Amino acid sequence: MAKTVKKSGPKKAKRNVPNGVAHIQSTFNNTIVSITDTTGEVISWSSAGASGFKGARKGTPFAAQTAAEAAARRALDQGMRQIEVLVRGPGSGRETAIRALQVAGLEITLIRDVTPLPHNGCRRPKRRRV
């Protein structure tokens, strides 16, 4: 019988990063929260799908809240205290994700909407008739 060998993968070194930037990408189908340092290197990330939600439930505000809490918890372990929040996209989880970051214990210094707006680019999808 073969012995089971426990592999220890590359562990990310714990760094002390006092302030950073939270990037929240909120679409109609999912919400992705990435917390970076000021240079743009990712400290922690989470998404509604990574938090255990599947299908249509990934687009809900509660899924966005859960994803933001998970990312904030990992960022707090790295020593983060203050963040700027950059929000992108039209999804329903935008405000909930920001509130979850604040409740988790991160001090929000700035909230900026960086949703890209086309200057008459691609044609929009046709209107849904339900």
Curated annotation (Swiss-Prot):
Naming one, the record's GO cellular component terms include: ribosome
What's an example of a GO molecular-function annotation for this chain?
rRNA binding
Q: Which UniProt keywords apply?
A: Ribonucleoprotein, Ribosomal protein, RNA-binding, rRNA-binding
The domain of life is: Bacteria
PROSITE patterns from the entry?
Answer: RIBOSOMAL_S11
Ribonucleoprotein recorded as keyword:
yes
GO biological process annotations for this chain's record?
translation
Report the function annotation for this chain. Located on the platform of the 30S subunit, it bridges several disparate RNA helices of the 16S rRNA. Forms part of the Shine-Dalgarno cleft in the 70S ribosome.
User: Quaternary state and partners of this protein?
Assistant: Part of the 30S ribosomal subunit. Interacts with proteins S7 and S18. Binds to IF-3.
Q: Which family does it belong to?
A: Belongs to the universal ribosomal protein uS11 family.
Stated name of the protein = Small ribosomal subunit protein uS11
> What species was this sequence derived from?
Synechococcus sp. (strain WH7803)
